[in-house]
UniProtKB/Swiss-Prot annotation:
Note describing how the cofactor binds: Binds 1 [2Fe-2S] cluster.
Binding site for [2Fe-2S] cluster: C11, C24, C56, C60
Transmembrane region(s): none
InterPro entries: Fdxn_Azotob-type (IPR048111), Thioredoxin-like_sf (IPR036249)
One Gene Ontology term from the biological process aspect of the record: nitrogen fixation
Key words of the record: 2Fe-2S, Electron transport, Iron, Iron-sulfur, Metal-binding, Nitrogen fixation, Transport
Function: Ferredoxins are iron-sulfur proteins that transfer electrons in a wide variety of metabolic reactions. Might be involved in nitrogen fixation.
An example molecular function term from Gene Ontology annotations: metal ion binding
Family listed: Belongs to the 2Fe2S Shethna-type ferredoxin family.
Record-linked NCBIfam families: fdxn_Azotob
UniProt organism field: Azotobacter vinelandii (strain DJ / ATCC BAA-1303)
Cofactor(s) needed: [2Fe-2S] cluster
Protein name: Ferredoxin, 2Fe-2s
Subunit structure: Homodimer.
Amino acid sequence: MAKPEFHIFICAQNRPAGHPRGSCGAKGAEGVYNAFAQVLIQKNLTNRIALTTTGCLGPCQAGANVLIYPGAVMYSWVEPADAAIIVEQHLLGGEPYADKLTPAEIW
């Protein structure tokens, strides 16, 4: 793969049940990753946009979290249905998806 135009990082951190910070893994990160992967495949974008799981991105209380570079744009409370919107609106359209942007007070 050549240098990607965008890189999507999906937090997939897991912690034990009852951990005070929770985890994106327990908040559906696997489904979010799979949804992004399917959108990239369907739109033939896998050669332009990299998709990677990562450890903790910080705002665990707001998971599942997604971080996109360039621009360091963080999305929180992301659900699988948001993947298509984020790809279409942000990555292809150039406008971040305001409904899921991580609030400044937590990141």
